[in-house]
């Protein structure tokens, strides 16, 4: 697979050197302003993003960390090492983004696991059970997932439809503009694999992702049992007061902006609570706002044609700088 590089602008040409002739106050102030501006410019970091094939010898621990991040509060329910092995096994498709060469840790990964061919693998069984339990409240979504992901009367290889699990995760400060080329390369690799009669002839793709709800800061509960009952009474009183006021609109946002495009091209999607949601951490997850961040699980099922359509829309909406 070829590499693609995104080059950013080089160092600034602004000259901020002082001169002995600048003795007047106005000149000194101008010089200080230039120096402050130069400091800001120098703090801008230029980074080259290089695209690499996934490497089992190098990317295993980073992939586990990305999986831990992707599964949120429920990451402890799965054997992440086994999932990482499935992602990185020989001849797998997918891409990583690195900045310091092939042997450095990735800043982002995108790959796919063949769920249909791995229905009997323990960790995949566990993952499917988890997903089916989550989608019980969405009947149509749940029914199609059961048809695609459970062993009924047919054998794995005789199934009419095959499903892939897309694993897409990155550092939170990675620009979304790196994602369209990663998806495009994934589609190209799977197309070549189809020609070689490999295991990537998918009809559907399941995407596990994350969103978050912005919530008012919550007061941490005191662990002292003597104060617990008093706190519960206070909370009940607060709820009664809030009930008399107009309800605040629920604010949701995306960790992965490309998920909005994927969701717009499918009817099978949903946002769900984590099993192990830690309410006490909501307030500590505040970033740059007065609100806390309450993460949620996002599940998207999209067919092959609509995934290809989504990638084109990603390229249009998130073009390279």
Curated annotation (Swiss-Prot):
One GO CC annotation: nucleus
Classification via Pfam families: BCCIP
Protein origin, superkingdom: Eukaryota
Compositionally skewed regions (Basic residues) per UniProt: 230-242
Signal peptide coordinates: none
Low complexity bias (residue ranges): 15-39
Keywords, alphabetical: Cytoplasm, Nucleus, Protein transport, Transport
Function text: Involved in nuclear export, actin cytoskeleton organization and vesicular transport.
Name by which UniProt lists this protein: Protein BCP1
Chain's gene name: BCP1
